[in-house]
């Protein structure tokens, strides 16, 4: 009997009905799947019936068990199994996969946000279905005006639609986690940057992330006050007036398109200011 290791954030899901619901939610056109944290291999087994799968397991003991359990699938090329930290592998040349892939995972809660953000930024990742803490799931899947709407919600919705599919009862895990878990799905339909992308290049995308960090720095304060720490307040007030936005708006009350528009205007204002300064 394998015991879950706390330092790896392990909670093994073995409920067949829940595992089947995850498989059924994967888009029909997916060919390659990347799985992070296969654990005992219950989800891996189901994935391998349909998809070529690449799995990353950080726990060496579990890796050895999986290597034996799926020896045939590894031999015939249906499964690529690595004993590696997926977060570290993301930073390596080639990332998690040399091909386009769909991410499916029961993510450790302590690294879930970081992993989802990596997947969002990874151009080879076509989307994801992951199980995470419900509190985090709500932040990624929230819509404008929801109290949970955040910078994470905006980043998740830029390329497609992020939705919370269903909750998973703690008693379906071994050991049971102390929090409710939820499964979210993100299917990308747009490119983040490039010729047909939302942003011109990676530098502009990073600037937008910094803009969002400023916007949501203090969720209880007004958006105008938050942004004023990084941008000229008078210029912002003019932007708000031209867009018919109330100056007492809280960060969660503005929609994604309006955030993009304010960012674009402030970026253009900054570029004009730099050009004027270079001419003096």
From Swiss-Prot:
Keywords: Cytoplasm, Methyltransferase, RNA-binding, rRNA processing, S-adenosyl-L-methionine, Transferase
Functional note: Specifically dimethylates two adjacent adenosines (A1518 and A1519) in the loop of a conserved hairpin near the 3'-end of 16S rRNA in the 30S particle. May play a critical role in biogenesis of 30S subunits.
InterPro entries (alphabetical): KsgA/Erm, rRNA_Ade_diMease-like_C, rRNA_Ade_methylase_Trfase_N, rRNA_adenine_dimethylase, SAM-dependent_MTases_sf
Name the record gives this protein: Ribosomal RNA small subunit methyltransferase A
EC numbers for this chain: 2.1.1.182
Gene for this chain: rsmA
Pfam family, one: RrnaAD
Native organism taxonomy: Bacteria, Pseudomonadati, Campylobacterota, Epsilonproteobacteria, Campylobacterales
Binding of S-adenosyl-L-methionine, residues: 11, 13, 37, 57, 85, 106
Superkingdom of origin organism: Bacteria
Organism, as annotated: Campylobacter concisus (strain 13826)
UniProt family annotation: Belongs to the class I-like SAM-binding methyltransferase superfamily. rRNA adenine N(6)-methyltransferase family. RsmA subfamily.
């Amino acid at each position: 009997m394998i015991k879950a290791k706390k330092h790896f954030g392990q909670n093994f899901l073995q409920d067949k009905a829940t595992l089947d619901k995850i498989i059924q939610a994967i888009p029909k056109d997916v060919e390659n799947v990347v799985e992070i944290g296969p654990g005992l291999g219950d989800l891996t087994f189901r994935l391998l019936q349909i998809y070529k799968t690449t799995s990353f397991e950080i726990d060496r003991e579990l890796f050895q068990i999986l290597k034996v359990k799926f020896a045939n699938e590894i031999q015939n090329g249906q499964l690529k199994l690595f004993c590696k930290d997926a977060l570290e592998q993301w930073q390596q040349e080639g990332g998690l996969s040399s091909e386009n892939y769909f991410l499916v995972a029961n993510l450790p809660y302590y690294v879930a946000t970081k992993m989802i953000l990596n997947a969002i930024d990874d151009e080879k990742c076509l989307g994801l279905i992951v199980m995470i803490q419900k509190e985090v799931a709500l932040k990624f899947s929230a819509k404008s005006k929801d109290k949970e709407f955040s910078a994470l919600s905006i980043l998740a919705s830029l390329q497609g639609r992020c939705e919370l599919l269903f909750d998973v009862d703690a008693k379906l895990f071994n050991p049971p986690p102390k929090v409710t878990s939820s499964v979210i799905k993100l299917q990308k339909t747009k490119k983040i940057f490039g010729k047909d992308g939302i942003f011109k290049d990676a530098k502009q995308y990073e600037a937008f992330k910094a803009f969002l960090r400023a916007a949501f720095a203090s969720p209880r304060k007004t958006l105008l006050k938050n942004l004023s720490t990084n941008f000229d307040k008078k210029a912002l007030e003019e932007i708000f007036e031209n867009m018919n936005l109330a100056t007492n708006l809280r960060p969660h009350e503005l929609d994604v398109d309006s955030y993009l528009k304010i960012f674009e205007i402030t970026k253009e204002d900054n570029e004009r200011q730099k050009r004027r300064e270079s001419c003096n």
